[in-house]
């Protein structure tokens, strides 16, 4: 289960990197994508921490 979360985080990070490159010319869109990317990473980290710390 943990590896699935890691893969999801990697996929989200690479997808945001691709979209960031695509929208690089539009500054407002790029800022929005960066904010979204940061939120996604925070969410992934929190989910991973919760999963690791949770007794199964």
From Swiss-Prot:
Subcellular location: Secreted
CC per GO annotation: extracellular region
Tissue: Expressed in fat body and ovary.
Keyword presence, Protease: no
Keyword entries, A-Z: Secreted, Storage protein
Keyword set includes Secreted: yes
Record-stated family: Belongs to the hemocyanin family.
Function, in words: Larval storage protein (LSP) which may serve as a store of amino acids for synthesis of adult proteins. The biosynthesis, accumulation and sequestration of storage protein-1 takes place during metamorphosis and saves energy for the non-feeding pupal stage. May also be essential for egg formation.
Name of this chain's protein: Sex-specific storage protein 1
Species whose genome carries this gene: Amsacta albistriga
